[in-house]
Amino acid sequence: MAKIIGIDLGTTNSCVSVMEGGEPVVIPNAEGSRTTPSVVSFQANGERLIGQVAKRQAITNPEKTIISIKRYMGTDHKVNIDSTEYTPQQISAMVLQKLKADAEAYLGEKVTQAVITVPAYFNDSQRQATKDAGKIAGLEVLRIINEPTAASLAYGLDKMDTNEKILVYDLGGGTFDVSILELGDGVFEVKATNGDTKLGGDDFDQKLIDYIAETFKAENGIDLRNDKMAIQRLKEAAEKAKIELSSATQTNINLPFITADATGPKHIDMNLTRAKFNELTHDLVQRTLEPIKKSLEGSGYAMSDIDKIIMVGGSTRIPAVQDAVKDFTGKELSKGVNPDEVVAMGAAIQAGVLTGEVKDVLLLDVTPLTLGIETFGGVSTTLIEKNTTIPTRKSQVFSTAADGQTSVEIHVVQGERSMAADNKTLGRFTLSGIAPAPRGIPQIEVTFDIDANGIVNVSAKDKGTGKEANITITASTNLTDDEIEKAVNEAKKFEAEDKKRKESIEIKNNADQIVYQTEKTLTDLGDKVSAEDKAQIEEKVKAVKDVKDGEDLEAIKKATEDLTQTFYGISSKIYQQANPEGAQGAGFDPNNMGGANAGNASAGNDKKDDNVVDADFKVEDDK
């Protein structure tokens, strides 16, 4: 059976995992790292870089380097690169393609199916956008699961016989979630979830960037935030400082030649203490505490009921975050999981559940936000409460608001506000053909259906006429089937171009290597090579050099092959001249390996018994 991979598609970093021998295993990328930066960069020559190589050149190419695209999933945001517009789904698909390719290289087989995680507080359009990204990348997304839920699966897989209530605190690069779960007898039941999709490590970085920029402006009168290359250097320095302050109490930020004015170049050289960092980011840390309170209220549990607190996401390494959670909950934090990898591992476990590789595990997740429709007066009428276990189906009967009304518009909303206009519109559709009647008489049954991915379907039926209309929620920010198909084809084109470019690089590198090796060997051999042979090799070397920087790959391959064959021929001639007796036997004859002839094993050795003395020996048992 083909492998299904589990993917944590993160704001700043992504991770891919697979089940092997009943255990989730993180797949290293082509660069050897276990996580991949969610960064995409477009080069001047049309080349596309993804992951660590893209992040590495962000300073020199800030305008064409895209970071943290996950924050725009489910919106109409577009990225314009060289007059071509890309949606967040397309950029995310490029990251997914990289993860898919790395998984295929690791597994040695094609990968076509995946389980992808999303923040628990993602709304419907954000979930749809994630599925679309998977499709564009050539992946069938079998399940979308919430990140804290995935983390709990990874945490609890080897604790199937225990009964625990756990709180998962998930602070990633761009999003924040809290989920309360109950684990017992293989059932992972989410009781409540809360969060903030606009809060994460990026915001901690931004606080530092602003502080450094303001300090520099006060000293030099220059605002570095107006310089794209400078701001990219600040971002890199801020992230590095944040990471260092998780283990050290002070760090140095040193950015030479950050900018220049009439007086000459300007540099940044400043020390930053952990205390100052904590002061700058205090409000962000405090913002994470309210969702803990709300998720507890939603679950019906008190803090004293919680057995374990699982910290997930790279930003939970920040000491101030750990201290705040400890102080707020009054509990020690569990250190048993890797915060960067546990979500992807949980996704792989869910993939194992779907294939049957992981047995006796039941995952019961919840919808994070209230779902309803707009009714008379602009009121948002709830059909499905937040924290309802999914999949679920709920129906309610409504009526018309005016006499003789023959059609109704169903306005589907998601959110916690009492007025529909204050919530997020998921979609609208019209039910027509209602029999004319006084208001309040027609009976219109509205049904909400949420699948295991958290994707919403809504239908409306006139119970009098049997007329029915329905909609699978695809918000205006999501892509149509045609747009997805177009994006899929573009992604395949990119993949083919990347493959061709990689092949070109390998062929040219091979040509370079052979030219270098040939010239080095010629130098080493010196006058052992005749002038005629040397001229012949140099002619072939020149032929390779003439074509190796061009784009005719066949010509490069042919010239390289000609050089290789010529060099091998001349090398053989040199060795024959150096060892005329041994030249006839390439390697040794196994038939010579025996008795007194054991010493004659070298190639072409016809000499007999060159004073070889056989030694007698006997084996004595140990006493």
Swiss-Prot record:
Entry's transmembrane regions: none
InterPro entries cross-referenced by the UniProt entry: ATPase_NBD, Chaperone_DnaK, Heat_shock_70_CS, HSP70_C_sf, HSP70_peptide-bd_sf, Hsp_70_fam
Biased composition (Basic and acidic residues): 605-623
Keywords, in A-Z order: ATP-binding, Chaperone, Nucleotide-binding, Phosphoprotein, Stress response
Function according to Swiss-Prot or TrEMBL: Acts as a chaperone.
GO process annotations (BP): cellular hyperosmotic salinity response; cellular response to acidic pH; cellular response to heat
Protein name per Swiss-Prot or TrEMBL: Chaperone protein DnaK
Induction: By stress conditions e.g. heat shock.
Chain segments carrying region Disordered: 580-623
Gene3D superfamilies reported in the protein's UniProt record: 1.20.1270.10, 3.30.420.40, Actin, Chain A, domain 4 (3.90.640.10), Substrate Binding Domain Of DNAk, Chain A, domain 1 (2.60.34.10)
Domain of life per record: Bacteria
Ubl conjugation is among the record's keywords: no
Protein family: Belongs to the heat shock protein 70 family.
